[in-house]
UniProtKB/Swiss-Prot annotation:
One of its GO terms (cellular component) is cytosol. It is found in: Cytoplasm. Residues 1-61 form the TGS domain. It catalyses: tRNA(Thr) + L-threonine + ATP = L-threonyl-tRNA(Thr) + AMP + diphosphate + H(+). Its cofactor is Zn(2+). Belongs to the class-II aminoacyl-tRNA synthetase family. Homodimer. Catalyzes the attachment of threonine to tRNA(Thr) in a two-step reaction: L-threonine is first activated by ATP to form Thr-AMP and then transferred to the acceptor end of tRNA(Thr). Also edits incorrectly charged L-seryl-tRNA(Thr). This is Threonine--tRNA ligase. CDD domains: TGS_ThrRS, ThrRS_anticodon, ThrRS_core. One of its GO terms (molecular function) is metal ion binding. SMART domains: tRNA_SAD. Its EC number is 6.1.1.3.
């Protein structure tokens, strides 16, 4: 007679073993209809799962994040059902849930076209609207293997052979004549899977190994209702308009090319943004009392072996050789900073020592993962390392947190998710040391009134860490900032300081990044602003235009005044209609367009118009200079009308 305890603390007793769905039905018909799965004693299970002993139970519906993920996983199975009907020779590989959707890797002789994807989506909808029950059968390993071998599903057989223990009991999910294998749970009925959209295809190697066969990966999104689906598709449409690759080309910021994959060719205007960002971060470094250093791009393999990077990152490092010595181009700055710390005897009075670098790093990312500025091989880290004593950790981390929030607020990022990752099973150092370190990070977050999620066991083997994830205007997540304690690297590379007791001690090292990669952050900013950069970052801050040749000299005078005042301005003296010039510079997102006619010239004024089309009226040139300089120096987010 199992007693089921519900989330509100109420209890229900049943005569016999009872399914999750039965419990939902005992509460109400509406809940039974909405029930996708259950969480029994903390574990997600199918709605058909029998509960035989006393247990806690939460009913999972499509309103829950877990319910949405289950629904998406079932849509992957639905894709398999449909593709096997349209192309029976297809071999199914894996079909997991991803952010906002799912994908399935399939082995199919023909390349799927756009028309094929449309036909596949139509068949999926046709099947889903039959509202058939999904039937789960738990079988032996051998039974599962026999099922898939009889259907020539070689990838499923390989998964069984290589990934599933012989004494395991795989779950087979029956979608009418189609069978798929999964841990589950899945929806009990396909009425939950009506709102989806297939999005794109790409290539993907089986097992992610380039030595294996290239499969076709079909991506889709799925939601609980039509409203959510349409809202997501609208966000995607807006994201496409904001794509930094498209805007970067339109505004002539940078380009990439095949001869240097993952390396950025910065054009003049893009490089202006880069340097302004660098100047801003340098200002923060001065405010927070950092030294700025510059380490070499390339160091001997021996050093990377001592640091431990060679064992863990060798595949991601570019290497070269000279005079019988092997070198690696640095993928990160930290070993170089320890070398700088090691020059000269350090005392406890020298700590904390805060060392920052705009380090040019390179990582041999797979070519298929490269994506504009967001995923590159050559990048610049706004990296810093703080060498401190253990009793200084909390104060230093607290200062790092303030610096992170201070920086992000300048760009208008207010929705910041924070995670604290604690000790993993395999780690160095004593439990007492980890206790103190984790408490220091937690206390620093609490001291700054920062809410955070705990991620037990997710820290690095050498120390706990804090991660800062930005959410942009489209609610996309970008993990940028990190504060990571390191108890290992200083000792491995021989870093010590003399303590108050006159003994040698190994400093704690705090790895700290705010923007992460300068390139990636510029990509994020480009998409966040849709190319409407704040005035201080805009490559061209004002363009001055004449109406007739009569004002040409006056325009040049205005431009000179602006430039001498530190405002990036250019003249447009082309023999074109003023409306044409304004439209062209509006498309270039120039913040201010200044128009000079005879009246303005005679009055020593300028007519001011913004890139959003707002007429701000006429200004004395000196007054306009004062206003623009104020906007630039205070780094306001938007020009006046925005």
């Amino acid at each position: 007679m199992p007693v089921i305890t519900l989330p509100d603390g109420s209890q229900r007793q049943f005569e016999n073993a009872v399914s999750v769905l039965d419990v939902a039905a005992s509460i109400g018909a509406g809940l039974a209809k909405a029930c996708i799965a259950g969480r029994v004693n903390g574990e997600l299970v199918d709605a058909c799962e029998l509960i035989e002993t006393d247990a806690t139970l939460s009913i999972i519906t499509a309103k829950d994040q877990e319910g949405l993920e289950i629904l998406r996983h079932s849509c992957a199975h639905l894709l398999g059902h449909a593709i096997k009907q349209l192309w029976p020779q297809t071999k199914m590989a894996i079909g997991p849930v991803i952010d906002n959707g799912f994908y399935y890797d399939v082995d199919l002789d023909q390349m799927l076209t756009e028309e094929d994807i449309q036909a596949l989506e139509a068949r999926m909808l046709e099947l889903a609207q039959k509202d058939y029950d999904v039937v789960k059968k738990t079988v032996s390993w051998q039974e599962a293997r026999d099922v898939f071998e009889s259907r020539s599903e070689t990838y499923k057989v390989a998964i069984l052979d290589e990934n599933i223990a012989r004494d395991d009991k795989p779950g087979l999910y029956h979608h009418e004549e189609y069978i798929d294998m999964c841990r589950g749970p899945h929806v009990p009925n396909m009425r939950f899977c009506h709102h989806f959209k297939l999005q794109k295809t790409s290539g993907a190697y089986w097992r992610g190994d380039a030595k294996n066969k290239m499969l076709q990966r079909i991506y889709g999104t799925a939601w609980a209702d039509k409203k959510q689906l349409n809202a997501y598709l609208q966000r995607l449409e807006e994201a496409a308009k904001r794509d930094h690759r498209k805007i970067g080309k339109q505004l002539d910021l940078y380009h990439m090319q095949e001869e240097a994959p993952g390396m950025v060719f910065w054009h003049n205007d893009g490089w202006i943004i880069f340097r302004e960002l660098e100047t801003f971060i340098r200002q923060k470094l001065r405010e927070y009392d950092y030294e700025e250093v510059k380490g070499p791009f390339m160091m001997d393999r021996v050093l990377w072996e001592r640091s431990g990077h060679w064992d863990k990152y060798a595949d991601a490092m570019f290497t070269t050789s000279s005079e019988n010595r092997e070198y690696a181009i640095k993928p990160m700055n930290c070993p170089g900073h320890v070398q700088i710390f090691n020059q000269g005897l350090k005392s406890y009075r020298d700590l904390p020592l805060r060392m920052a670098e705009f380090g040019s790093c390179h990582r041999n990312e797979p070519s298929g993962s490269l994506h504009g500025l967001m995923r590159v091989r050559g990048f610049t880290q706004d990296d810093a390392h703080i060498f401190c004593a253990e009793n200084q950790i909390q104060d230093e981390v607290s200062a790092c947190i303030r610096m992170v929030y201070d920086t992000y607020s300048t760009f208008g990022f207010k929705n910041i998710a924070v995670k604290l990752s604690t000790r993993p099973e395999k780690r160095i150092g004593s439990d007492e040391m980890w206790d103190r370190a984790e408490e220091a990070l937690s206390a620093a977050l609490k001291h700054n009134n920062i809410e955070f999620d705990l991620q037990p066991g997710e820290g690095a083997f050498y120390g706990p860490k804090i991660e800062f994830t930005l959410h942009d205007c489209l609610d996309r997540a970008w993990q940028c900032g990190t504060v990571q304690l390191d108890f290992a690297l200083p000792g491995r590379l021989g870093a010590t300081y003399v303590g108050e007791d006159n003994d040698r001690h190994v400093p704690v090292m705090i790895h700290r990044a705010i923007l992460g990669s300068m390139e990636r952050f510029i990509g994020i900013l480009t998409e966040e602003t849709a190319g409407y950069f704040p005035l201080w970052l805009a490559p061209l801050q004002a363009v001055v235009m004449n109406i007739t040749d009569n004002q040409a000299d006056y325009v040049k005078e205005v431009v000179n005044t602006l430039n001498e005042s530190g405002i990036r301005a250019k003249a447009d003296l082309r023999n074109e209609k003023i409306g044409f010039k304004i439209r062209e510079h509006t498309l270039k997102r120039v913040p201010y367009m200044l128009v000079c006619g005879d009246k303005e010239m005679e009055a020593g004024e300028i007519a001011v118009r913004t890139r959003r089309g707002v007429d701000l009226g006429k200004f004395k040139v000196t007054d306009l200079v004062e206003q623009l300089r104020k906007e630039i120096s205070t780094r306001v987010l938007n020009v006046v009308e925005e």
